[in-house]
Amino acid sequence: MSNSYQTQGYTVNNAGRRLVVDPITRIEGHMRCEVNIDEQNIITNAVSCGTMFRGLEIILQGRDPRDAWAFVERICGVCTGVHALASVYAIEDAIGIKVPDNANIIRNIMLATLWCHDHLVHFYQLAGMDWIDVLNALKADPRATSQLAQSLSAWPMSSPGYFFDVQNRLKKFVDGGQLGIFRNGYWGHPQYKLSPEANLMGFAHYLEALDFQREIIKIHTVFGGKNPHPNWIVGGMPCAINIDQSGAVGAVDMERLNLVQSIITRTADFINNVMVPDALAIGQFNKPWSQIGTGLSDKCVLSYGAFPDIANDFSAKSLLMPGGAVINGDFNNVMPVDLADQQQIQEFVDHAWYRYPDDQLGRHPFEGITEPWYNPGDVKGSDTDIQQLNEQERYSWIKAPRWRGHAMEVGPLARTLIAYHKGDAATIESVDRMMSALKLPLSGMQSTLGRILCRAHEAQWAVSKLQYFFDKLMTNLKNGNLATANTEKWEPASWPQQCRGIGFTEAPRGALGHWASIRDQKIDVYQCVVPTTWNASPRDPEGQIGAYEAALMGTQMAIPDQPLEILRTLHSFDPCLACSTHVLGDDGSELIAVQVR
């Protein structure tokens, strides 16, 4: 039955042809997307569905709070470590543990490293092939490609011979008939706008980034012992410091610290001379995408803030990445966010496969309930083989978080807009420079293209903070301050019988919060609201759509059976994609299989 209604400035209408994209994998599992298109192939309805139940919040009940970080870290293997960071913050907040300055600095180094790594991997490996036509690169003139690259930056790997070699490697790959990960791309799609030379340059940098990302993450192995899933500890960091070779064997020494500095220098070089110029090149060829995929970004955005410069201080004066919330498009009024305020953050489940005592009411995470209740309702197909979801009923394993009743967008774009409108000088300078180079207004950031540009902006910001915190660490070490952990309250006997705490930070993909309640030295309630929960949110009792759903509204598809436009916008949020996708017609028959990168 068709349904039409108004919400958040959009007319949602599920009449017309239905396309199903399933699965699209993301951080916590797999994601499904369904859209309706009208006679002009314009999306009039979008449905975002999380198709995998997580359950870690249930697993944590009754466990030792000091172990929580090791469990929740496994929520995601891509933005690895960030859930552990939020977890140790939450447990320390509950118990009342103060960490040493070095522990705070090293945690910020770990987070800044993750931002640099994740933004590079997203830009090239996950979203890049939505903009770079690999096969078109075979038509490029390597000499012209070299001239283009050298006009953009002083990156040394830009000679005609270098691009000739890359093109030759690609040609052999294609001629062999084994395209591998590039096999199911929509090469030649009319939305690919880069010149052959820009495509060859982008493909070459794709290969370089694939190799270089392995180097960046070595910083995690220095301070966390391994990657993915580095080690953390409630009360600080588990790495001892031994700069004069007199301490513990295996501790962080000057050789490893020099390695960290070398990686930071090379990371800054790659971001400034490869990633940022590539992002601007994509922008130059794709300016219409500065008006596509706006979604909630011009209405409601949210950031918790991150990178406390002062140990144990999460106030606005300490956070180098500002936090705040904007609703109803009023960017002149960036409101403070309090994660303990039960009227601010609430999660709804009336369109999710969970159950509350009253499904029409939202619940603050401290009062959160994770009770799965799979009840797809009246769908096309069967409960185990759904051909088409019914968004008027329950349709996702993702709850619907709301801030003061509003659906919000989180992530790099949200953070950038909030920092910009709070007057952060570095953000204003960077954003204005980018938009001036592209001859686009600031509103052009509120788009699919804008999310891509914000990744480049944030990568530059993060690597500058990586150097900043490393310099702070080295100053402390030179002054004889080697402490990395506070174990005064390690033993449960020193804890209150009942306590609760909140840990928050900004994952590369957006606002991340953990809420922990402890009773009798064991976890009583543990709730996570992750970035994808916000962005991939289903509808709520008011019919408000989530950020993914809103961003797809109004998008015109050139070739519905080749939904590059859908993938571009979804990838701009970075739901951590890796699997093959199937596009289904409204009768349930498969139209085409695509590789989602």
Curated annotation (Swiss-Prot):
The protein's required cofactors: Ni(2+)
Main EC class the enzyme belongs to: oxidoreductase
Pfam families xref list: NiFeSe_Hases
One GO location term (cellular component): plasma membrane
Residues where Ni(2+) binds: 76, 79, 576, 579
Subunit (UniProt): Heterodimer of a large and a small subunit.
Name by which UniProt lists this protein: Hydrogenase-1 large chain
Gene from which the chain derives: hyaB
